[in-house]
């Protein structure tokens, strides 16, 4: 075969591939061809769920870094495995009898993997959240992060318990504690208190030069926090770091350093290194507040969980917290792009699968479900639950969304997604567009600093979800933008607005 013939065959194959992908409309092409995107790579597909056909596409079979659109798969697998009505049950047991109000043994909190254990619940049956992932430096979640633990302490007190001869122990054996989430580096654990961070809120003084003050949430004696922070002039960029005392082996002495401008408080955070130990301490605090005299577990030895489990019977249960349905937890994950919660789900699903087969993990559960649905996973790569290690093709994502839409829980999944220009991570995207309020989709972002050019590079921006056209056509879509490097302010915002604009244009023109 001659080189010219090989070239001709390659050109013909490429032409056939392009012909098989209906090109996007001119208005969308104009967005893609903007000068700032000249080095970037686009991929997308808009797919009619009822006609089961592609409306238009670009690079639909190529793999793209998807960012947090990965959470669509993670959450969908959990919907399919746990069910939308699944409730987490976190229980407190005693290991011995009660004599004169004193437990002759330990009090053991059995972690259930509830991602929202300490999140305040609205009376309407939803969890409180802000439109930004709390773990990424967003403001503290509304309400007292220890309110659920206080309710459990009140239940124990109502049983007449006034103390324990043993210790307060957290059984975190549901799955392995200690792996750090890829995006935030927060520790994954079956016990999640305040998203496994302590909020460090820095309040400036009234005038420049005055010291700033620090408060923490949850309020606990677990930490000693020193402040070396100064108030700067209004408009000065905030610079706050939370440092651990290197001489403190327990990581319980912190110092806040830096500056904050006159005005509103600045939020920082400290990632809890061992959530189960932190949980033992704060649970002991709230039990003592309820009049139950206890101490947290002492020493570094891992408890004998098998021995403790013999006490996990109804007659020894002293308190229980039942979560809202999983569909409410999914709203927090998808609306705010909650990394820790999403990263925990494969561990949780793996722990349930391991009951049936010891060699199962969460990704085995996902693969079996996806392939059982007839989806070709050649267009998908997933190494974590949140999106720090994944690749997807636009065509895989739209077929996945097609499958999800047909499930009994598909409406709950759809309603948990951010809404364009309205809420969640899409609250500020295309707020004045005709499609605002009409597109439900998950965002995704992965960026890093480019020290060579002193700028941010957006490795990935994604948007995938659904809308219904004005004529009633149900559309699933996936849009990806990779390798966006341009000297523009806030490039992730520029990319996010562009993807939102593409979705909005599609809503306008698809009849």
Task: Please name every model-derived segment.
Residues 14-15:
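N-terminal signal peptide c-region/cleavage motif recognized by signal peptidases
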Residues 57-77:
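Short active-site loop at a secondary-structure junction
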Residues 33-58, 299:
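A short, well-structured edge-of-sheet supersecondary motif
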Residues 28, 52, 71-78, 168, ...:
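Residue-level preference for non-acidic, small/hydrophobic
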Residues 1-6:
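Bacterial N-terminal signal peptides that target proteins for export
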Residues 55-57, 147, 343-511:
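Small-residue-rich helix-loop
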Residues 7-8, 18:
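Cleavable N-terminal signal peptides
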Residues 21-34, 80-377, 471, 494-497, ...:
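Conserved serine DD-peptidase/penicillin-binding transpeptidase domain
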